[in-house]
Curated annotation (Swiss-Prot):
The gene is atpD. Produces ATP from ADP in the presence of a proton gradient across the membrane. The catalytic sites are hosted primarily by the beta subunits. GO terms for molecular function: ATP binding; ATP hydrolysis activity; proton-transporting ATP synthase activity, rotational mechanism. This is ATP synthase subunit beta. F-type ATPases have 2 components, CF(1) - the catalytic core - and CF(0) - the membrane proton channel. CF(1) has five subunits: alpha(3), beta(3), gamma(1), delta(1), epsilon(1). CF(0) has three main subunits: a(1), b(2) and c(9-12). The alpha and beta chains form an alternating ring which encloses part of the gamma chain. CF(1) is attached to CF(0) by a central stalk formed by the gamma and epsilon chains, while a peripheral stalk is formed by the delta and b chains. It catalyses: ATP + H2O + 4 H(+)(in) = ADP + phosphate + 5 H(+)(out). Pfam families: ATP-synt_ab, ATP-synt_ab_N, ATP-synt_VA_C. It comes from Fusobacterium nucleatum subsp. nucleatum (strain ATCC 25586 / DSM 15643 / BCRC 10681 / CIP 101130 / JCM 8532 / KCTC 2640 / LMG 13131 / VPI 4355).
Length: 462
């Protein structure tokens, strides 16, 4: 058994000297404390037989000279059916007070991405039941989806609604990785999943805001390893939710500074693209099964050009951008219909009718955006009749993009709506064709299908 001694402790970073053989990079080391066993992960070889490690838990109670044992392998976690319905931490230990896991299979969290010839490349649409997403930025089965937004514009609520809509209808396995977010939200999600019965097909892996940077950096890999096992061993189509991928980058930046690396742009770690690539390339579909991932991406100061969101962009198949301007109009989900994109929005994938309606909707909204300056200065009266009609339809389209969510029922008092793609296309096509030009725009706010808008307009007229 390879043993070493602690020589230096700086916050979450611990240096350890080994007399004989040095442990490999990413090996897990263990230190016995009074009430627990602390796990450290090797990050650097410094020379003079010293390795630099990052702690996966608080370093309180550590002292220089303490004995450290090399496990000879990376952090290894339980996977398979045993983890369903349970909450795990970064080390795969249950933290839900429901007894030990009786897992048969264990896997290291550091693994290679699938081989090139194992990948599956067919494109199939994933229906979410959320109008604005299904119409303008449709999600791909086995694809990577990013939800971009600043603080408080609704990323987590949207992720919870997607879990509610997709996980319930999907019937497959879901894995939720809570990376550096609020513990309260994690608790709420667990409660909601337990109530709806989805929990029996879900594994939750949490490394929240209060955890040290090492745990926040690695917890996404723990969740991903659980999802990979369901894909590879059981041939499942797995849903992987990550909230929030920015915190993964943020933790990497903290660890990088503690390890003494020279920072790059905006103070981020120099290996930002490499770290992100190592995670994202493992989230993919193979011949045996698929992983569809939905990742919330916090955008610092609403700046999409910040290196963290910008690096994430390049890995995604669909991006749903949440806008503070739309949220300020009281339209939720606050998805920006002109900024959100999807590789699947092409005639070959979604079909001619869907593609044409989506493009026409974007055209009308873009024209409205151009006219807003004129309206602000000269007022609506100065517009031509054609432009007035465009503005009227654009405002109806904007409001029709709003939708009551099931997960927000307790706050809004409105019953959540799931709208099939066919109904979404039909509704927007009818607005574009002018069939509902006589209906006031308020009738389109927070309804599901177009019939509900018509019914609401009759109620308003009473």
């Amino acid at each position: 058994m390879n043993k070493g001694t602690i020589t230096q402790i700086i916050s979450a970073v611990v240096d350890i000297a080994f007399k004989d053989e040095l442990p490999a990079i990413y090996n897990a080391l263990k230190v016995k404390l009074e009430d627990k066993e602390l796990v450290l992960e090797v990050e650097q070889h410094l020379g003079n037989n010293v390795v630099r490690t990052v702690a996966m838990d608080s370093t309180d109670g550590l002292k220089r000279g303490m004995e450290v044992i090399d496990t000879g392998k990376p952090i290894t976690i339980p996977v398979g059916k045993a983890v369903l319905g349970r909450i795990l931490n970064v080390l795969g230990e249950p933290v839900d007070n429901q007894g030990p896991l009786n897992a048969e299979t264990f896997l290291p969290i550091h693994r290679e991405a699938p081989e090139f010839d194992d990948l599956e490349t067919e494109t199939e649409i994933f229906e979410t039941g959320i109008k604005v997403i299904d119409l303008l930025a449709p999600y791909i089965k086995g694809g990577k989806i990013g939800l971009f937004g600043g603080a408080g514009v609704g990323k987590t609520v949207l992720i919870m609604e997607l879990i509610n809509n997709i996980a319930k209808g999907h019937g497959g396995i879901s894995v939720f990785a809570g990376v550096g977010e609020r513990t309260r939200e994690g608790r709420d999600l667990y409660g909601e999943m337990t109530e709806s019965g989805v929990i029996t097909k879900t594994a939750l892996v949490y490394g929240q805001m209060n955890e040290p940077p090492g745990a926040r950096l690695r917890v996404a890999l723990t969740g991903l390893t659980v999802a990979e096992n369901f894909r590879d061993k059981d041939g499942q189509d797995v849903l992987l939710f990550i909230d929030n991928i920015f915190r993964f980058t943020q933790a990497g930046s903290e660890v990088s500074a503690l390890l003494g690396r020279i920072p790059s742009a905006v103070g981020y770690q120099p290996n930002l693209a490499t770290e992100m690539g190592a995670l994202q390339e493992r989230i993919t579909s193979t011949k045996s099964g698929s992983i569809t991932s939905v990742q919330a991406v916090y955008v610092p100061a609403d700046d999409l050009t910040d290196p963290a969101p910008a690096t994430t962009f390049s890995h995604l198949d669909a991006t749903t951008v949440l806008s503070r301007n739309i949220a300020s109009l009281g339209i939720y989900p606050a998805v920006d219909p002109l900024d959100s994109t999807s590789k699947a929005l092409s005639e070959d994938v979604v079909g001619k009718e869907h593609y044409e309606v989506a493009r026409k909707v974007q055209e009308v909204l873009q024209r409205y955006k151009e006219l807003q300056d004129i309206i602000a200065i000269l007022g609506m009266d100065e517009l031509s009749d054609e432009d007035k009609l465009t503005v009227s339809r654009a405002r109806k389209i904007e409001r029709f993009f709003s939708q009551p969510f099931s997960v927000a029922e307790q706050f809004t008092g409105m019953e959540g709506k799931y709208v099939p793609v066919k109904e979404t296309i039909r509704g927007f096509r009818e607005i574009l064709e002018g069939k509902h030009d006589d209906i006031p725009e308020q009738a389109f706010l927070y309804v599901g299908t177009i019939e509900e808008a018509v019914a609401k307009s009759k109620d308003l007229a009473k």
